[in-house]
Amino acid sequence: MSHQHILTLFNLLPVATNISTWWNFGSMLLTCSIIQMTTGFFLAIHYTANTNLAFSSVIHILRDIPNGWCLQNLHSIGASMFFICIYIHIARGLYFGSYMNKKVWMSGILLLTILMATSFFGYVLPWGQMSFWAATVITNLLTAVPYLGTNLTIWLWGGFAINDPTLTRFFALHFILPFMIMSTSSIHIILLHEEGSSNPLGTNSDIDKIPFHPYHSYKDLFMLTLLLFTMMSIMSFSPDMFNDSENFSKANPMMTPQHIKPEWYFLFAYGILRSIPNKLGGTLALLLSIMILLLPPFTHTSHIRSMTFRPMAQFLFWTMITTFVILTWAASKPVESPYITISQMASTMYFLFFIINPLLGWMENKILNTNH
């Protein structure tokens, strides 16, 4: 069989000539999924979902299993890389108006939600101090639900406190959810190829398309090499870069860490949660910080799809990215002044982006119509 026939699948996929490096993160996310599922499977073989043995089983993987340290660190760093890629992927969608392809965008938000749940359950599994207390704080938010809250929390915990049943079910969920991620990813990709991907100009690219292979496949391969190189470098030189030092101690329900916080990739949402002094209000704001991403396809007002030719929208977008970084930083700090005020201001700025952006689009349309 000729080289051409083997790659028919890729050759039959027409892609816009001008898609930039920002379009490579989808394939990088798929690679992250494969790495996570492979390393996760081998870790699950040696892991014990028991409150007395979980922490010891992780130490056993690191010390006694051949290349166990490599598996564990790859899985841990891979999770951070997964979130870096998905946040860039979402930011690209917001900047270039990819959200106008509604079905793809909605399936993407569903994917993000499942991924966040998966990583939260995974963070609890080592049963370190921060694992235990982060799980306690986050699951406790369910008690904010009126009438049903307490019953829901007890049902989730499998008892009146976080204990063995909680860890067992979290392990089961952490194992099963990646299969949901893979199936939802397939739907996401199928829906994308129904219409085709957008391009940096936000124009219709039907008149100017080239085969995916070899033009874009090599570009993808280059970014994948960079991703793997970054992961291997962190694993070799600074494997605990993304870890919390509290998690090197076994979970102790009798001793609370000085500053409870989730993994770095949840800090922006945690910052929004913390900035509201009311429990129910904070929980709603936490949910809204993700669910608000469902709005842009319905609130897009500008005649121009992409922000490439919209300088004011670009300024607004980069303000939002800065806000995201500030929220992440402030949430990693103790709950004291000035961090409380900074978190509150940044949270307001974060939500304002989704309100100001459509107004800005409407204003741009007015200016363009006036000039005509």
UniProtKB/Swiss-Prot annotation:
Name the Gene3D superfamilies for this protein.
Answer: Cytochrome Bc1 Complex, Chain C
Query: Main subcellular localization, coarse class?
Result: mitochondrion
Which cofactors does it use?
Answer: heme b
Pfam family example for this protein? Cytochrome_B
Recite the UniProt cofactor note for this protein: Binds 2 heme b groups non-covalently.
According to the record, the segments passing through the membrane are 25-45, 69-90, 105-125, 170-190, 218-238, 280-300, 312-332, 339-358
Recorded topology in the membrane: Multi-pass membrane protein
Q: Where in the cell is it found?
A: Mitochondrion inner membrane
Per the UniProt entry, the disulfide pairs are none
InterPro entries assigned to the protein according to its UniProt record, in alphabetical order: Cyt_b/b6_C, Cyt_b/b6_C_sf, Cyt_b/b6_N, Cytb/b6-like_sf, Cytochrome_b, Cytochrome_b_C_euk/bac, Cytochrome_b_N_euk/bac, Di-haem_cyt_TM
Residues that, per the record, bind a ubiquinone:
193
Q: What else is known?
A: Heme 1 (or BL or b562) is low-potential and absorbs at about 562 nm, and heme 2 (or BH or b566) is high-potential and absorbs at about 566 nm.
Describe the family membership recorded for this protein in Swiss-Prot or TrEMBL. Belongs to the cytochrome b family.
Q: How does it assemble?
A: The cytochrome bc1 complex contains 3 respiratory subunits (MT-CYB, CYC1 and UQCRFS1), 2 core proteins (UQCRC1 and UQCRC2) and probably 6 low-molecular weight proteins.
The protein depicted here goes by the name Cytochrome b
Q: Look up and give the organism this protein is from.
A: Acrochordus granulatus
